[in-house]
């Protein structure tokens, strides 16, 4: 079948557009698993509240209806102001300096409150995973929300990336003092080497609170060194 020059030109243009990060700044999210609700109230039990006020981190293993992946939520108090927490979390280029498992990161595009970021995770046993995320932030007087969803990265093989991941940071003023941070993540890692499924699931759950721990340390080191 003969393909006209006009058709070839259009196909080339369409492919280039789809491979451009700017295209995904306008695209719809690929996942609905961890879409945040700005109005969501975090309900804490008396025990959870006591733990959080004592500086502990509450870990929740949430149901992921109709999906293969897992959803975890860590809740804890951050030091400092909302402005400080927002500045640290939206400084994506610094993630490799403190975020667990983040080994490399490249910011591909920025448009207003949205950024396209390509991340490489360094995992135990020599495994590496890469993915492209769209981060979107929003602010109000009482707090802020930073959400992300996975975007297509056609150059990667399935074994080089995860099937899906999405999530958000919700940080709001806490009546008990400081700022209450909710770190919510859904991940479907895709195929896992035979016999290692339980290992990686256990590792993900046990290390998940480290996200808040490292964020606390980063805020203190930048704004309150020596305290």
What role is predicted for each listed range?
Residues 85-86, 95, 171, 183, ...:
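Hydrophobic pocket/interface hotspot
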Residues 2-13:
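Bacterial N-terminal signal peptides that target proteins for export
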Residues 11-22:
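Bacterial N-terminal signal peptides
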Residues 27-112:
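Hydrophobic ligand-binding cavity/cleft-lining segments
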Residues 76, 135, 182-185:
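Short, hydrophobic/aromatic-enriched beta-strand segments in well-ordered soluble domains
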Residues 58, 154-206:
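Beta-strand/loop substructures that line and gate deep hydrophobic ligand-binding cavities in soluble
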Residues 76-83, 89, 93, 162, ...:
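Soluble non-cytosolic domains of exported or imported proteins
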Residues 62-69, 96-97, 106-161, 187-188, ...:
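Glycine-rich portal/gate segments that line the openings of hydrophobic small-molecule binding cavities
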